[in-house]
Regions:
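Feature captures hydrophobic
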Residues: 1-138
Length: 138
């Protein structure tokens, strides 16, 4: 219901913010499951550097994912010392990204999505996000 809400559900700003927050957390925790159990992405995971990626929405919620030896440790909230940060300018940008309704390359170019820190860590997590989207699609 909240991961794939109807448009009228998203019309309420508080419900929209809740849906984005729930989806952000689902992405962080879903990456763990995909990364540790999907044989398609396991080779990528085994070559990921150790570190912490923080996913956050400017002036909004955050989640982070620590990667160590091919295992994932997701948590809600900001990371103490992230190695890389994936930051969305606002709730709408985050939502559009999670729903696959945004050209991420142009969003990075326009500053709606900001990448900071050890970018190869974010690049390594990106295929896991894509694979998670595959599992969550209709």
């Amino acid at each position: 219901h909240y991961l794939k809400p109807q448009p009228e559900t998203l019309a309420d700003p508080e419900t929209f913010a809740f849906c984005v927050r729930v989806t952000l957390y689902a992405v962080a925790f879903g990456i763990k499951e995909v990364g540790e159990h999907d044989p398609e992405v396991r080779p990528i995971v085994l070559n990921l550097p150790d570190g912490t990626v923080e996913m956050r929405i400017e002036q909004g919620p955050a989640a982070h994912l620590t990667i160590k030896g091919g295992s994932f440790y997701p948590q809600r909230g900001p990371a103490e010392n992230p190695n890389a940060i994936l930051e969305f300018a606002d709730l709408q940008t985050a939502w559009d990204t999670f729903q696959g309704n945004i050209d991420t390359f142009s969003a990075v170019g326009s500053g709606r999505i900001k990448l900071r820190g050890f970018i190869p860590l974010i690049e390594g997590v990106n295929p896991l996000m894509d694979r998670l989207a595959y599992y969550l699609s209709d």
